[in-house]
Amino acid sequence: MLFRSGSVNPSYQLGTGSWDYLITADYVIKRKRFGLNTMVNYILKTENQKNYRFGNQTNYAATFFYFHESSKFTLVPQLGIAGEIYESNSQHGQTVRNTAGNLLLSKIGFEVGKNKFSLGANAMIPITQNLNAGNVEARYRWSINLNYAL
């Protein structure tokens, strides 16, 4: 995510210098070959050594999937939405203006598996956003993953 000036928002940098706590819930419902995976998590952020506290964050997602299984592999195409809600940052106990926001993304991807291995990829494109009073713009995201079941 970039400021319109081209610099990167500090809220999205690696490491906040604080201890943060994650509360998460995940639920999958499946009927025959169709399913829905839902997820919500809340990140409780604490103040760092510079008396700066990034705002708490809520993330959520709902992903529909279809499970196709053949004798050689499994294929699971996915389609859904994901969202993020950012509370305001604070410094020395004072709210930092224009640091809250929200983002809603569309999500498409797949997983392909064989034996204990699976490979997946997904892309996310913003549907609507209001980040840092419009000063930050989220662009597309993509990821790939490789898993091994123990």
Which positions does each model-derived feature cover?
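Outer-membrane pore/translocation modules
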Residues: M1-R53
